[in-house]
Amino acid sequence: MAKTMIGVIGGSGLYEIDGLENATWQTVETPWGPPSDAILTGMLAGVPMAFLPRHGRGHVHTPSSVPYRANIDALKRLGVTDVISVSACGSFREDMAPGDFVILDQYIDRTFAREKSFFGPGCVGHVSVAHPTCPRLSGACESAARDAGITVHMGGTYLAMEGPQFSTVAESKLYREAFGCDVIGMTGMPEAKLAREAELCYASIAMITDYDSWHPHHGEVDISDIIATLSGNADKGRNMVRRLPALLGAERAPCPHGCDRALEFAILTAPDQRDPALVARLDAVAGRVLG
């Protein structure tokens, strides 16, 4: 049976977890360039962990400049099997209030300035992202959040915007009323798509910080309010993460939903027509099927 290794992508506060043993910052090189930062690895309750600050320590990357491909490749290269994404989001629903967590299960991708696939000319691949998150891993996150006393909502649709500016009132109302989205953020895509291409189980937790700009009784998004809410959410996030090793266990069976076999029939380019340079770059992401 395979071994579990949990990867967490999120803010800098998440990796300051009591009980993380043998903590070491590792620099990981990838064919897609450097990841956002070095990756903190260690053991938590007997399970290997890897923490990657999405924007880098000190928040140096914009949502558009985050090296999403390098981040996912680096985690896969380290042996991560299960990726937990944690990010700040605005809410389109009254009942999803600031301080609440939402376990996402769907996305609408409105980003336009990011590389969204590991594949390309010379090695064409098409994976299904009909269900972009892993129900097994999402269920574990829900249990961990409830055990930590967090108000958590299971299921929600995330509107991924390019940023870095926040929405206009008209955009906010469009996404809420016409699109039927539940939350909005700037970093959920293409991260979820790339995790699927890398055959990683992926769960995403939206930490609600505000009501975006649609709400008639709340003002426009204020970054100072977001930072204040994030401070409290970081404590909740750490309490959730520290419960995950016990829920997932050190031994890992194949994903019942097929996340770890997403590339089984996805690559269409004939073997004799594949670009050797691109195939070499895919060694960690798709080595299982490319040989």
Task: Tell where the protein language model's regions lie, with residue ranges.
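Generic non-transmembrane alpha-helical segments
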Residues: 136, 140-151, 239-247
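His/Asp/Glu-rich mid-to-C-terminal helical/loop segments that flank catalytic regions of hydrolases
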Residues: 213-261
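Non-catalytic positions within long, well-ordered alpha-helices that form the structural scaffold/packing
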Residues: 76-79, 176-177, 196
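Zn-dependent metallopeptidase/amidohydrolase metal-coordination segment
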Residues: 189-224
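Acidic, Ser/Thr-rich low-complexity intrinsically disordered segments
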Residues: 262-291
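Active-site/ligand-binding-proximal alpha/beta "capping" segment
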Residues: 144-182
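Metabolite-binding pocket within alpha/beta catalytic cores that recognizes anionic/polar moieties
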Residues: 1-131, 287-291
